A protein has these predicted regions:
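Active-site bordering "gate/hinge" segments
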Residues: 1-225
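Short, surface-exposed charged micro-motifs
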Residues: 183, 242-244
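Broad, structure-driven detector of short, well-ordered beta-strand segments within folded domains
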Residues: 193, 245-247
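Short, catalytically relevant binding-site loops at active-site mouths
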Residues: 199-200, 233-235, 259-262
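Structured beta-strand/loop patches that form or line metal/cofactor-binding pockets in enzymes
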Residues: 219-238, 242
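C-terminal, non-catalytic macromolecule-binding modules
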Residues: 248-265
Length: 265
């Protein structure tokens, strides 16, 4: 299964070519998965560069992180990223709350000083990249499944024929591209907006695995009403629940959640 996933990532998601360099980054790594990626990279004539990390160590580093330290890390990794043709990140965690006690001001500083130049300004526009999660007992627990059953489910959706899926998406993409008004209604949600002229993009296994959505965006000042999310969202180790946004002419004028102060921070 890892071998097939590695083929999907190398040959399809980032379409690595002979002589190209790929940065492989895995958190709480599975040696079998990393090995499969290295082997597949060599099989297509590419050059793998591997970085392995552990969430517990990352937490300790972040708790004492200074801005000067983050700047040095950013300088080194930005230079490395600029030499890469592709980037594969596989994120895994035994405890989804591992970073919950990292101070918010440090997290914000790290995002500004490190993530912005390395990932937002370099990786996103300059490399072929794909990001995915990796199955763990923690993820299985969230899905209320056994670890074995969750792993079977995970690999079955990650190893789909995404080329076939891409073709099946075309009719919906065409419909979205000619749509103007959208009205969403549901429990706690009554939202209207326009998508006229925005276009639609297929997510068919190139940037994220597993994949399968077709996305668009609203005309910026056309969004009005309220939207309430019925699923939790993990951000920097904190679990937001009952998130609700109220929009007026495209601007969020009210945001609430299980920790309203934190979400407005």
């Amino acid at each position: 299964r890892q071998t097939q996933l590695a083929k999907n990532l190398i040959r399809n998601a980032v379409n690595l070519q002979k002589g190209e360099k790929v940065w492989i980054n895995m958190t709480a790594y599975d040696p079998a998965m990393v090995t499969a990626l290295v082997e597949e990279t060599y099989a297509v004539g590419g050059y793998p560069f591997v970085v392995l990390s552990d969430p517990k160590i990352e937490r300790k580093l972040m708790q004492g992180m200074t801005e000067e330290q983050a700047k040095i890390m950013a300088e080194l990794d930005k230079a490395k990223m600029e030499k890469m043709d592709a980037y594969i990140a596989i994120r895994n965690a035994e405890n989804i709350f591992e970073s919950v006690d990292v101070p918010q001001d440090i997290s914000a500083m790290y995002n500004r000083v490190y993530s912005q130049p390395v990932h937002m300004e370099t990786r996103l526009p300059k490399t072929k990249w794909v990001v995915l999660r990796y199955p763990s007992p923690s993820m299985a627990q969230q899905a209320q499944m056994s670890t074995e059953a969750f792993e079977d489910f995970y690999f079955s959706v990650c190893n789909l024929d995404y080329n076939k899926m891409s073709k099946a998406m075309d009719p919906l993409k065409a419909l979205m591209e000619k749509t103007d008004k959208v009205h969403l209604k549901g429990p706690g949600t009554d939202l209207t907006f326009s998508i006229k002229g925005i276009g639609a993009m297929k997510c068919d296994g190139e940037k994220n695995i597993p994949d399968g959505e077709i996305y668009t965006a609203p005309v910026r000042d056309s969004v009005n009403g309220i939207i309430t999310y019925n699923t939790p969202s993990m951000v920097q180790g904190f679990k937001y629940e009952n998130v609700s946004f109220t929009f007026e002419n495209g601007k969020i004028v009210n945001a609430t959640a299980n920790d309203t102060d934190r979400i407005n921070h």
